[in-house]
Protein backbone atom coordinates (compact mmCIF):
# COMPACT_ATOMS: atom_id res chain seq x y z
CA UNK A 1 0.00 0.00 0.00
CA UNK A 2 1.40 3.41 -0.93
CA UNK A 3 2.09 6.15 1.57
CA UNK A 4 -0.53 8.38 -0.11
CA UNK A 5 -3.15 5.66 0.35
CA UNK A 6 -2.27 5.34 4.04
CA UNK A 7 -2.51 9.12 4.51
CA UNK A 8 -5.87 9.13 2.73
CA UNK A 9 -7.21 6.37 4.99
CA UNK A 10 -6.02 8.21 8.11
CA UNK A 11 -7.54 11.47 6.89
CA UNK A 12 -10.91 9.91 6.08
CA UNK A 13 -10.95 8.21 9.51
CA UNK A 14 -10.20 11.56 11.14
CA UNK A 15 -13.06 13.17 9.20
CA UNK A 16 -15.47 10.43 10.27
CA UNK A 17 -14.45 10.80 13.93
CA UNK A 18 -14.76 14.60 13.82
CA UNK A 19 -18.12 14.40 12.03
CA UNK A 20 -19.32 12.02 14.74
CA UNK A 21 -18.13 14.39 17.46
CA UNK A 22 -19.66 17.47 15.83
CA UNK A 23 -23.09 15.86 15.48
CA UNK A 24 -22.92 13.73 18.64
CA UNK A 25 -22.99 10.42 16.79
CA UNK A 26 -21.03 7.25 17.30
CA UNK A 27 -18.27 6.77 14.74
CA UNK A 28 -20.20 3.80 13.28
CA UNK A 29 -23.37 5.87 12.81
CA UNK A 30 -21.33 8.72 11.32
CA UNK A 31 -19.65 6.29 8.91
CA UNK A 32 -23.00 4.85 7.84
CA UNK A 33 -24.49 8.33 7.37
CA UNK A 34 -21.51 9.59 5.35
CA UNK A 35 -21.55 6.42 3.26
CA UNK A 36 -25.28 6.56 2.58
CA UNK A 37 -25.34 10.25 1.63
CA UNK A 38 -22.12 10.24 -0.43
CA UNK A 39 -19.87 12.05 2.04
CA UNK A 40 -17.23 9.32 1.89
CA UNK A 41 -17.36 9.33 -1.90
CA UNK A 42 -16.79 13.09 -1.79
CA UNK A 43 -13.78 12.72 0.53
CA UNK A 44 -12.28 10.00 -1.61
CA UNK A 45 -12.71 11.92 -4.86
CA UNK A 46 -11.55 15.29 -3.50
CA UNK A 47 -8.88 14.19 -1.03
CA UNK A 48 -6.10 16.09 -2.80
CA UNK A 49 -7.89 19.39 -2.16
CA UNK A 50 -9.81 18.69 1.04
CA UNK A 51 -6.83 17.54 3.11
CA UNK A 52 -5.26 20.98 2.61
CA UNK A 53 -8.28 22.76 4.10
CA UNK A 54 -9.15 23.42 7.73
CA UNK A 55 -11.03 20.51 9.27
CA UNK A 56 -14.07 22.68 10.06
CA UNK A 57 -14.32 23.58 6.36
CA UNK A 58 -14.27 19.92 5.38
CA UNK A 59 -16.94 19.17 8.00
CA UNK A 60 -19.14 21.94 6.57
CA UNK A 61 -18.59 20.58 3.06
CA UNK A 62 -19.54 17.07 4.21
CA UNK A 63 -22.72 18.35 5.79
CA UNK A 64 -23.65 20.20 2.59
CA UNK A 65 -22.88 17.21 0.35
CA UNK A 66 -24.92 14.89 2.55
CA UNK A 67 -27.85 17.31 2.68
CA UNK A 68 -27.83 17.57 -1.13
CA UNK A 69 -28.09 13.79 -1.24
CA UNK A 70 -30.98 13.48 1.22
CA UNK A 71 -29.23 13.68 4.60
CA UNK A 72 -31.01 15.56 7.38
CA UNK A 73 -28.26 16.58 9.83
Regions found by a protein language model. Give the residues of each.
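Long, compositionally biased
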Residues: 48-73
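Alpha-helical structural motif
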Residues: 12-15, 26, 39, 54, ...
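N-terminal, charged low-complexity regulatory/assembly segments
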Residues: 12-15, 43-44, 62-65
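Short hydrophobic/aromatic-rich motifs at helix boundaries and adjacent loops
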Residues: 1-3, 33-34
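N-terminal acidic leader/helix
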Residues: 2-28
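Amphipathic, hydrophobic secondary-structure cores in small proteins
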Residues: 20-22, 26-52
Amino acid sequence: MSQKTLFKIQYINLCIDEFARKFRLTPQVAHNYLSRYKGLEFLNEHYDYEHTQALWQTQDALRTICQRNGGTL
